[in-house]
A protein has these predicted regions:
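Extended, charged catalytic domains and RNA/DNA-binding interfaces, predominantly
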Residues: 1-199
Length: 199
């Protein structure tokens, strides 16, 4: 039991999440987790935040009881989207986001090469928002998981799921433009009517 997507005050949106120490204290004590993936925005892009994150994981690993992962969140807009990047071991060098990928001109191919070489994995998430991915670079060897539920923020299993945001019309917009797995195709008018319907 655990969580693969927690933020701390190192993230640009982590002002309500607490410190790295708070995250691990919660995971070890209150939640009794077996694993935790802290995935602060762009923490793997700067040397200091990546070093600090790795140091916390190394210090707080409890063999046989608690296995935190070395990770960060790679945050881009659609079509490349947000991805949590996780490693089982420390010491993986910082991997900056190439300009062409940041601009959406290139996919995640270079990231995937880096992950294959370093033994890491990627988990796309926020798939129902403008920060989702278009799955153009799908590679199950380095991206074997996709987040569909966040314990702290929104859920993306389906519209109307617990903690889902009924105003997220991107569910429908995305299904009209892209083939996104198991989503149901509906006309835009139908999606808008459902989102605006009182609960």
């Amino acid at each position: 039991r655990g969580d693969m997507h927690r933020h701390t005050d190192l993230s640009w949106d982590g002002n309500r999440d607490g410190t790295l120490c708070d995250a691990y204290r919660y995971a070890l004590d209150a939640a009794a987790f077996e694993y935790l993936g802290v995935a602060d925005h762009q923490a793997g892009e700067t040397d200091y935040t990546w070093w600090l994150t790795q140091k916390a994981v190394t210090l707080l690993t409890v063999p046989g009881r608690f296995a935190p992962l070395y990770g960060y969140e790679r945050s881009l807009s659609y079509p490349n989207g947000h991805r949590n990047i996780m490693f089982a071991k420390p010491g993986v060098p910082v991997f900056p986001i190439p300009a062409a990928e940041r601009q959406g001109k290139e996919g995640a191919g270079k990231l995937f090469e880096h992950l294959r070489a370093a033994g890491g994995i990627s988990m796309p998430h926020t798939s129902a928002t403008g920060a989702g991915t278009d799955w153009r670079d799908a590679d199950p060897n380095v991206e074997p998981l996709a987040e569909i539920y966040q314990g702290y923020r929104h859920s993306y299993e389906h519209q109307g799921a617990p903690r889902s945001n009924p105003k997220l019309l991107t569910w429908c917009r995305r299904t009209r433009r892209r083939r996104s797995g198991h989503m149901i195709r509906r006309p835009r008018r139908s999606c808008t009517a459902r989102a605006e319907k009182p609960a």
